[in-house]
Amino acid sequence: MTTNAASLRKTFTISNDHPAPGSVEERTAFANISKDLDGSLKKYSRIKLAPRTVVALPSLSLDQDILSKIKGAVHYEERMLCLLMLLRMPLTKIIYITSIPVTDSIVDYYLHLLPGITGQHARQRLTMLSCYDASVKSLTQKILDRPRLVERIKQLITDPDSTHLTCYNITPLEKTLAVQLGIPLFGTDPDKFYEGSKSGGRKTFRSSGVNLPEGFEDLTTKEDIVKALAALKRKDPALRKAVVKMNDGFSGDGNAIYKYPAVAVDDRLEKNISETLSQQLKTVAKDVSQELFFEKFREMGGIVEIFLEGDIKMSPSVQCLISPAGKVDIVSTHDQLLGGDDGQVFIALSFRPMKRIACRWQQKEERSQKLWQQKVRWEDLPLISFL
């Protein structure tokens, strides 16, 4: 019997009836699909056997020029495979999307860690999808560029009311995808993106009374950087180094170190710093030129702060979960191990107990929905900086 290949091919009705990215219509649609998320999450926390679907999107929606300098960046998408542990709940389904297929042996490794559930049972509730595209383009952008893949995901979502999208990081791209899929996004609205930047973070800490390195925020130009470097030097003539950081740099690769030359702290200080900037500024990412660094700095904005000196420096990290209702819970803490010439690059982490450091959230009587209004207290830690 002869079978027509076309008759076996899956067909999809591709819908182009989506609001334009960034439009008022998209923001309205996003708000509408997000309004019941808090109730749904509370339901799942109470009823472990409630059916639900999680669309896992480990997209690194970061600056692609900087990301391309990191070897093996595409494998960062495997970091969210820990979400497969949700399959221990027998009515939970997961749709996991990657740029390139994940090796079966890696998936099997995670599934065999599930307590009380066989790997075969979990496999039946797991769908792995791939774009078959190893380029440095954001995974979310790859999906949006493939309408058939978007429709495939939508067909796998049998109950949008019990489904949500969870991502590695959230940008307007993820917001657009959530609207196109018609499911809520478990994460902060990208409209609050500034609060998560280095400039926004410094302002949050300052307003919360947390000690942080002397520095300046919301800088964009070389002239801004020079003025900030000069102001720090005037405040502390013994200062040897300062750090210039892009707002949205990551793993330390968006940083540069400025080493002050032996110049007098006088009226010519700014001019001397400007003239020596190219010689005294060193980018942390070896493959990022100064030209590219300043170009990205103009696009993202950034900060300048003093370089923290000392033989023993700790870099604690805390992971917090902010519910749609504004409740903040601490999930975990760890100590970052930094390397590189100036100790700016994340290389590993340790979960060993940090006896001298305790992180406590002191909530106000009226719980705020904004993270920067929560009180953070770090004991025995004099300064907090942002990688």
Describe these PLM feature segments.
Residues S68, D108, L177-Q180, A228, ...:
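Short acidic, glycine/serine/threonine-rich loops at helix termini
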Residues E291-I312, P316, I330, D342-L387:
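A long amphipathic alpha-helix within ATP-dependent nucleotide-binding catalytic cores
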Residues D63-D65, T103-I106, L173-E174, F250-D253, ...:
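Flexible loop/turn segments at secondary-structure boundaries
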Residues P101, M246-F250, L308, I322, ...:
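Glycine-rich beta-alpha junction loops
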Residues D189-G301, S350-R367:
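Active-site nucleotide/adenylate-binding loops and adjacent lid/helix of ATP-dependent enzymes
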Residues M1-G196:
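ATP-binding N-terminal substructure of ATP-dependent carboxylate-amine bond-forming enzymes
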Residues A256, E305, M314-Q336:
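Beta-strand scaffold of nucleotide-dependent catalytic cores
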Residues P172, P184-F186, K192-Y194, S199-R206, ...:
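N-terminal accessory/precursor segments of enzymes
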